[in-house]
From Swiss-Prot:
Residues 1-21, 78-121, 585-610 are annotated as: Disordered. GO terms for molecular function: mRNA binding; single-stranded RNA binding. This is Protein high chlorophyll fluorescent 107. It comes from Arabidopsis thaliana. Induction: By continuous red light (Rc at 8 umol.m-2.s-1). SUPFAM superfamilies: TPR-like. May form homomultimers. Part of a multi-subunit complex in the range of 60-190 and 600-800 kDa in chloroplast membranes.
Length: 652
């Protein structure tokens, strides 16, 4: 259908308002079946157009459905049939200038429309209609597609303005401080907000998972780690590694292996995954597999003190002490401030009864990390074990002064005071340790053992039960059951003692002490056959660990590029450095033997002579730690301890 603007006859005479009217003609294209005989005219008033225009009837074809509007803008005529015939070649250009081609489809108006609607332009009406339709269309809102309440809450949190990235670091530090003060609920709230704002960052998942694990909320921690792996698309090796450690703690060894493998796939340079996986295999007795994993860790991650330290411990267990010392030396070269390496090396020397060398290594450990609680604890227990009770007490007090919230130091100090001082002071120290960390099982076990030795069997049973209520599947629980079994054995409850021994072995079947204690019980009852059967069961079920030195051949290519040099270092009798080390240790032993026959001097002077290092503990405390060696007993006063405990509980 076509329409044209055609002026009426009355428009030929100009008017003062310079107005005229046009008629809108609708023409139907020529169709063989139905030809249009007369046009339909609709009168439209126009303004500002003078002159006469008339209808031009172009030739139509059945395919031509375009809509034309011809308007004569001036008296001279922009487009007319005469000009069209005269200017045949310029027809196209004139048409483009004078003819307005309307390509927007229009709807036919019915006869019932009012004259006011007829005066409006059709394009404006269509635009207005489309605008109304667009207003009625719903805007895409992501939260409508989320059904669960947790998803809607997460979407609402993401919809808010996202804080700067520096706020994540500050929040993580604040949560760490709160967790250190045992304010786990506040720390959890902060970390949950971090996860809501930064779901792609793995650090909040790791921190929150560790807090949940400390509270024995292992199922929640597992769900959190799984969610973290999904949010990070499996690319965060730290979450995989923490999840693997959790599964290993729960006893799911196969699942833990799969997760450690996933951690190494996510990042083959993640040394903690290789090291944790190796420790798992060591506990399972797969020494060759553990060595292979540690070798891969060195290959992909480079020199690392923790891997060297674990390899050294394996060598020490196998009886290859010179290789163990060499690997410990490599660990301290990698990181001279690694307190763990110095302590492990010192324990090796203690096993070999080379006490001066061990003291020198303990000095290195506290100098590398002056506030490390493990260094002061191990050193203090060592000194007390070799007979230096006063020095051991002093070292434990120093560790407590530097770490007043650590329960292990107070536990060891309490046992030391019970053995060499009074039970009341020991009881106060153990009670304080249990208040610092109520979920620390060894504290309750030690306290129960002390009460049993004092004859308070009922109190001892309650304390043992309290320890088992924390977690009944750990190695500490196994030791607790063994100690409780001894209590029942001495009390005459033999059936209860047998049940407790059996429960302890169900947790840790490799406990030599538990097997032999049970066998001794049966032997004391006159059942020698049963006692021998129990001993045979231990030797039959124990894990046989076969370890040889064949792994060194393939391992040398990784630990040092200079293969020949390392071979010489590990070759007994041909290494000058090892010979010098052996000579030095022998000289230390001779010094120790010669000093044992002399009169004892002051503790500080005796230490300087034994170690030969000139290390003065009192000077070190004053200069490096700002502690007065004469005022270490202040924090251990019973009244001060009670006030501190009450303030700590009220603050929490």
């Amino acid at each position: 259908m076509h329409f044209f603007f055609v002026p009426n006859s009355s428009s030929s005479s100009p008017s003062p308002a310079n107005t005229s009217s046009f008629s809108l003609s609708f023409l139907t294209p020529q169709i063989p079946e139905n030809l249009c005989k007369s046009p339909t005219k609709i009168h439209i008033g126009t303004h500002g157009i003078s002159g006469q225009s008339f209808l031009s009837h172009p030739t139509f074809s059945s395919k031509n459905t375009y809509l034309y509007a011809v308007v004569d803008r001036s008296s001279s005529g922009v487009f007319s049939p005469q000009k069209e015939s005269a200017n045949g070649e310029g027809e196209e250009s004139n048409t483009e200038e004078g003819v307005l081609v309307v390509r927007r489809p229009l709807l036919e108006n019915s006869d019932k429309e009012s004259s006011e609607e007829e005066g409006k332009k059709y394009p404006a009406r269509i635009d207005a209609g489309l605008s109304n339709i667009a207003k009625k269309m719903p805007i895409f809102e992501p939260e409508r597609s989320e059904s669960s309440s947790s998803s809607s809450a997460a979407a609402a949190a993401r919809a808010q303005e996202r804080p700067l990235a520096v706020n994540l670091d500050l929040s993580l530090y604040k949560a760490k401080v709160l967790a250190r003060n045992f304010r786990y609920k506040d720390a959890e709230k902060i970390l949950e907000k971090c996860i809501a704002y930064w779901p792609e960052d793995g650090r909040p998942y790791v921190a929150l998972g560790k807090i949940l694990s400390k509270q024995s909320k292992l199922a929640e921690a597992r769900i959190l780690y799984e969610k973290g792996c999904q949010s990070t698309q499996g690319e965060n090796s730290y979450i995989w590694q923490c999840w693997a450690v959790l599964e290993n703690r729960l006893g799911n060894v196969r699942r833990a292996r799969e997760l450690f493998d996933a951690a190494t796939v996510a990042d083959k340079k993640h040394v903690a995954a290789w090291h944790g996986w190796a420790n798992l295999e060591i506990k399972q007795g797969n020494i060759s597999k553990a060595r292979n994993l540690l070798a891969k860790g060195l290959k992909f991650c480079g020199r690392n003190e923790y891997i060297y330290q674990t390899l050294a411990l394996l060598e020490a267990k196998a009886g290859r002490y010179e290789q163990a010392r060499y690997l410990f030396k490599q660990a301290t070269i990698c990181n001279s401030r690694s307190c763990a390496s110095w302590l492990a090396w010192a324990q090796l020397e203690i096993q070999q009864e080379r006490y001066p060398a061990a003291r020198k290594l303990f000095e290195k450990a506290v100098q590398a990390s002056p506030k490390n609680r493990f260094a002061w604890h191990v050193w203090g227990v060592f000194e007390a074990g070799v007979g230096n009770v006063e020095r051991g007490r002093k070292l434990l007090k120093i560790g407590h002064a530097l770490n007043p919230r650590d329960p292990v130091l107070l536990q060891s100090l309490g046992l030391l005071e019970y053995k060499h001082s009074s039970a009341n002071l020991a009881r106060a120290l153990l009670r304080r340790a249990s208040e610092l960390d109520p979920r620390h099982q060894p504290v309750w076990i030690a306290w129960g053992w002390m009460e049993w030795k004092e004859g308070n069997t009922t109190t001892a049973r309650e304390l043992y039960q309290r320890a088992l209520s924390i977690d009944a599947n750990t190695e500490s629980a196994s030791r607790c059951l063994q100690a409780w079994g001894v209590l029942e054995q001495r009390a005459g409850n033999l059936s209860a003692a047998r049940r407790l021994f059996r429960s302890s072995l169900n947790i840790n079947s490799q406990s030599y002490v538990t097997w032999m204690t049970w066998a001794q019980l049966e032997e004391d009852q006159g059942d020698t056959e049963r006692a021998e059967e129990i001993r045979n069961l231990y030797f039959q079920q124990r894990t046989e660990v076969v370890d040889d030195a064949s792994w060194v051949t393939g391992f040398l290519d990784i630990i040092d590029p200079a293969l020949d040099t390392v071979k010489r270092l590990l070759n007994f009798g041909q290494n000058n450095d090892n010979n010098r080390l052996t000579t030095t240790l022998r000289n230390m032993n001779r010094t120790k033997d010669s000093q044992s026959n002399q009169q004892p001097e002051s503790s500080a002077g005796r230490e300087d002579i034994e170690t030969g290092s000139g290390f003065n503990l009192d000077v070190f405390l004053r200069s490096k730690l700002s502690l007065d060696p004469l005022k270490l007993d202040v924090n251990l006063d019973s009244k001060r301890l009670e006030r501190f405990t009450r303030g700590r509980i009220n603050g929490a």
